[in-house]
Regions:
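Basic, short loop/linker segments at the boundary and entry of helix-turn-helix/winged-helix-like folds
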Residues: 28-73, 78
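Anion-binding and metal-coordination hotspots
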Residues: 3, 8-9, 15, 72, ...
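Hydrophobic alpha-helical membrane-insertion signals
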Residues: 1-35
Length: 539
């Protein structure tokens, strides 16, 4: 190699010193300063953080929950979620040494804090959403809703369905029959042959052990099947009790379905929830209502994809002042491709309370109502047999053995008609939907690498998700507002809340004093109604 000069590092034998003050470990523009001010200005006791108490006052004092909250916010911002990894960083990461002032809790303490404070973590996340409103970072007019599957701390094999348990039980029964045949064969051989020599691989003793193991397995499977039937659920998870097998586009995930509502102004998450449903059809109203409450608005527009289309959900949204835009999947394309006439070709005439068919004949309501499999009450509209017999479109509309055409109308079909009318001009809104709501999931999954949960059970998983959502919003707000402005906001907000608290306490004291004076006046008046009691308040 040609001799040339290269950059060289510092000799490991050369003495070096860190800055003399821990304060100098981070510069003035480091985001850990925003984390510090944010947590210090929170009323952690109000949020319900759990502080472990030493038995009888003995032992070391506990770590302040604010310090552990700072640690987790920093960790989730920088893709460090494991309690062991965070414990390692506390000994080598200068930013964390500054943030926790040199404290080094063990990994068990770190893990226990996240596990026990799931409700408080949700409260902190909601508090930050309130701060986003105060910073005027949310529009409060349009939100987009979407869901994504996240892996749970459970394998696909640990989650059993009723069908899978039945198949495993049937396999055990078949194995019983096979081993029973082997045992019968061995018994016959022992009756006719000399027992001298070593036992073979299919000896009675070995087979009996296998049969005993099969019996134990069969009892366990029967117990699991009984538990599943008693629970009323469709799946039984043996590791994480709330994780479920979720399927989308041929991909099966053992985990949870995370739902988010994202404001369109700056793509900030304003409401979220973790469920274990395998689809989104029952989530629209719950998420839209949660977003409406968090934003504290009287009206809201919500955008969602086809997976959220559900008549009952659309009606619930309309009842709560929420205007929903959800495209409906085209389910009649195959029928129309065959030249058949679908129910969509029938137009409802509100004045006549009848449907008009493509041949301009009326379908009128018949007596009685029907409750379909989804629990919806529907009204039956039927054509006249004479009209259908003489119709030139009969072959495309009816089968040879069907005398008349029937159309069912939901009792709240007007809700869907208004929705369909809105969707005719909603192309632009639907294009915006993807840009709004898919940004958070893309950021969390691809940039941060958060595709799975570390904890188990709804409560703990929801607490962990709250950390993810909080840190996503925190980083976006920091990039939008800037470090100095955000720190100043945290400080001013805390001062205003403190002043408000003092005023509230003073008002309560004055009210108590006035009440006491009124009671004294009443007592004095009852003793001497003729002589009014006079108070000298001047001196």
């Amino acid at each position: 190699m040609t001799i040339r000069s290269f950059k060289t590092g510092v000799s490991r034998e050369q003495p070096s010193f860190l800055p003399a003050r821990v304060e100098d470990y981070v510069d003035a523009n480091n985001l850990v300063r925003a984390i510090e001010v944010f947590v210090d200005k929170l009323d952690l006791e109000e949020f319900g953080f759990v502080v472990p108490a030493a038995a009888g006052g003995a032992g070391q004092p506990p770590y302040h929950p604010g310090d552990l909250l700072k640690l987790y916010i920093y960790g989730y911002l920088f893709r460090i979620r494991s309690s062991r990894a965070l414990a390692r960083e506390l000994g080598r990461n200068l930013e964390l040494i500054w943030l926790l002032r040199g404290l080094r809790p063990c990994f068990r303490t770190i893990a226990t804090f996240r596990k026990d404070n799931w409700a408080a973590l949700k409260a902190v996340n909601r508090e930050f959403v309130l701060m986003m409103r105060e910073l005027d970072l949310v529009g409060g007019e349009v939100v987009a809703v979407d869901g994504a599957f996240f892996h749970g701390d459970a394998s696909r094999g640990s989650i059993k369905t009723q069908r899978r348990l039945a198949e495993e039980l049937a396999k055990v029964d078949r194995d019983f029959e096979d081993y029973g045949a082997v045992l019968a064969k061995n018994d016959a051989a022992e009756a006719t042959q000399d027992r001298a020599g070593e036992a073979g691989p299919n000896s009675g003793g070995e087979i009996e052990k296998k049969v005993a193991a099969l019996m134990a397995k069969r009892e366990a499977l029967r117990a699991d099947l009984a538990r599943l039937e008693a629970s009323g659920q469709t799946q039984l998870s043996q590791t994480d009790p709330d994780a479920r097998l979720l399927s989308k586009n041929g991909r099966v995930v053992a985990g949870y379905n995370v739902q988010i509502a994202v404001d369109d102004k700056h793509k900030l998450i304003v409401a979220s929830e973790v469920v274990n449903d395998g689809n989104d059809t029952g989530q629209l109203h719950a998420m839209a209502k949660a977003a409406k409450e968090e934003l504290d608005v009287t009206a809201l527009t919500v955008l969602a994809d086809t997976g959220y289309y559900n008549g009952g959900e659309l009606k619930a949204c309309e009842d709560d002042g929420i205007v929903a835009y959800v495209p409906q999947a085209k389910r009649t394309a195959r029928l129309e491709a065959q030249g058949r006439i679908s129910h969509e070709a029938f137009v409802y005439d509100a004045e006549k309370d009848a449907y008009r068919c493509p041949a301009d004949k009326l379908l009128t309501p018949s007596e009685g109502r029907k409750t379909n499999t989804g629990g919806r009450i529907e009204i039956r509209y039927t054509s006249r047999k004479a009209d259908c017999d003489a119709c030139v479109l009969r072959a495309r509309c009816l089968s040879a053995k069907t005398p008349t055409r029937t159309v069912y109308r939901w009792e709240h079909e007007a809700v869907l008609e208004r929705h369909r009318a809105r969707m005719k001009t909603a192309a632009g809104r639907m294009r915006r939907r993807g840009a709004i709501v898919e940004h958070p999931f893309g950021t969390l999954k691809c940039r941060a690498g958060y595709r799975h949960f570390l904890l188990r059970g709804f409560d703990k998983v929801r607490g962990e998700w709250s950390l993810m959502a909080l840190c996503y919003n925190f980083s976006r707000v920091l990039s939008i507002v800037g470090l100095d402005k955000l720190i100043a906001f945290f400080a001013k907000r805390a001062a205003d809340l403190s002043l408000l608290g003092h005023r509230t306490a003073l008002t309560a004291a004055i009210v108590s004093l006035v009440t006491l004076l009124a009671q004294l006046c009443d007592a004095a008046g009852s003793k001497s109604a003729a002589t009014p009691l006079r108070w000298n308040l001047a001196g």
